A protein has these predicted regions:
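Flavin (primarily FAD) cofactor-binding/catalytic cores of flavoenzymes
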Residues: 1-46, 95-206, 210-231, 235-419
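Short, solvent-exposed coil/turn linker segments
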Residues: 33, 57-69, 180, 324
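Charge- and polar-rich, low-complexity intrinsically disordered segments of small proteins and propeptides
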Residues: 47-49, 72
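Tryptophan-centered motif/residue detector
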Residues: 50, 81-84, 112
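N-terminal beta-loop-helix "entrance" segment that forms/cooperates
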Residues: 50-58
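A short alpha-helix-loop-beta-strand transition element characteristic
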Residues: 53, 74, 94-97
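Flavin (FAD/FMN) cofactor-binding and adjacent substrate-gating region
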Residues: 59-92, 250-257, 261
Length: 419
């Protein structure tokens, strides 16, 4: 180690929407902790683009525009979506649009807010390791080791987002031909648009459905096989009453429940955020399916009640070995490329905390225990504070998953706890 690492009162890992919302809350706090220069945000990416690999034409956000980075916490914030529209001269025009913001526009909004904090962010700096610093028999500080240097802190916030969910059958496969939707657009670069590709898409949620529509439109001679463990695509629960699951008041109720009760509630409300598509997407998918029947040239095949038992590959094909769990009939699907619309997962213990695990309190599910203010429960001899920002669905409810619903409110709670 050359010299003493720089010290920061807070280091936040990840500068996507959760990290940006925290920066907004810190800036707007009465004591202005950002102005002291003692808050550092680290991100391994070159910018703060929101889902850049899945910004597909014709797609829009599936939450209300008031659930932006700041409005639920501070409706007067300069970082609201309304202020973004005003700054770009589109406020009145957007009011006439009659539909949600497009995903491209929402990504531009997120980037617009992120740019306001450029002086506090180190982009393209990946956190490699976090080590405990011991003094007088206790852990006093954390040493954050990155691709560029080292830093010390007493307060660490993980805003690093969820991990792509890769089913075990595909973990050892050629990643150039088995593609999670988190790598979707870049994986298509260089593919012949006119070739008669055989694509397989795994999953029953929004990303799977949107992938199918895009592939069929982008590659007019391609065939797509849509593979589902269940009975196929279903409409997500978009009604007002089911979506009260995302209300901030539900967090305290959910947090005090036992692990078994939490699991039951998550199972009950998952259709509000997972494994569902919206009405427009369902209509588009079925239209593509039906047009194939009319023309007698079907390009979309649906395989329901299909469990992928294993996958293998030849020099030029991927082969998915499947089984119907009810009839036990086995079959196979051959494809040039397999796209995984299988969503994301939250690790029970974030990998970056592996060296700190001896001091972390684990629950009955062997996951980190998260207090209501998002601080991890640690041993008495562990003095630093570690907070999770968007990684606490199992402890706080479905609003803490892949959703903007609680971003702003959570950022306010974190700011109060940190400073």
């Amino acid at each position: 180690m050359q010299g003493t690492p720089d010290y920061y009162d807070m280091i936040n890992i990840g500068f996507g929407p959760a990290g940006i919302a925290l920066a907004c809350a810190l800036e707007e706090a009465a004591h202005r902790p950002l102005e002291t220069g003692q808050c550092l945000f680290l991100d391994k990416h070159p910018n703060c683009a929101w889902h850049p690999e899945f910004l597909l034409d014709g797609t829009d956000i599936n939450h209300h525009l008031l659930r932006d980075l700041v409005t639920p916490r501070n409706p007067q914030s300069r970082h609201s979506f309304a202020m973004y529209l005003k700054e770009h001269g589109r406020l009145y025009q957007f009011g006439l649009l009659g539909r949600p913001a497009s995903r491209n526009e929402w990504s531009d909004y997120v980037a617009w807010v992120g740019k306001a904090f450029a002086s506090h962010v180190h982009y393209e700096e990946e956190v490699l390791e976090i080590r405990p610093v011991t003094e007088d028999g206790e852990i006093q500080l954390l040493l954050v080791m990155t691709s560029r240097g080292q830093y010390l802190t007493r307060n660490l916030v993980l805003s690093s987002g969820s991990t792509p969910n890769i089913p075990s059958q595909f973990e050892q496969m050629d990643c150039a031909r088995v593609i999670h939707t988190s790598r979707y657009l870049s994986s298509l670069e260089g593919l012949d648009r006119q070739a008669a590709w055989a694509f397989a898409v795994v999953g029953s949620g929004q990303s799977a459905g949107e992938s199918i529509i895009d592939l069929l439109n982008r590659f007019p001679n391609a065939q797509v096989t849509s593979i589902h463990r269940s009975s196929g695509f279903k409409i997500a629960q978009l009604g007002q009453f089911p979506n009260q699951a995302f209300h901030p008041d539900r967090v305290a109720y959910f947090h005090k429940l036992g692990q078994a009760e939490k699991a039951m509630i998550l199972e009950e409300v998952k259709s509000t955020n997972y494994s569902g598509i919206d009405v427009d997407e369902s209509q588009a998918l079925y239209s593509l399916f039906y047009e194939g029947l009319v023309s007698n040239q079907p390009r979309l095949a649906l395989k329901i009640f299909t469990h992928i038992e294993s996958a293998s590959q030849t020099p030029d094909k991927l082969i998915l070995h499947t089984c119907d769990p009810y009839t036990l009939e086995r079959s196979s699907v051959e494809a040039d490329y397999v796209f995984l619309g299988t969503g994301y997962k939250q690790d029970y213990v974030p990998p970056l905390l592996s060296q700190l695990q001896p001091w972390l309190s684990l629950g009955s599910d062997n996951g980190v225990q998260v207090e209501q203010n998002y601080r991890l429960t640690t041993a008495p001899s562990f003095r630093p504070a570690i907070f999770v920002n968007g990684l606490s669905e199992r402890s706080h409810g479905i609003g803490e998953g892949q959703s903007f619903s609680l971003l702003a409110m959570r950022a306010g709670i974190l700011t109060h706890s940190l400073f």
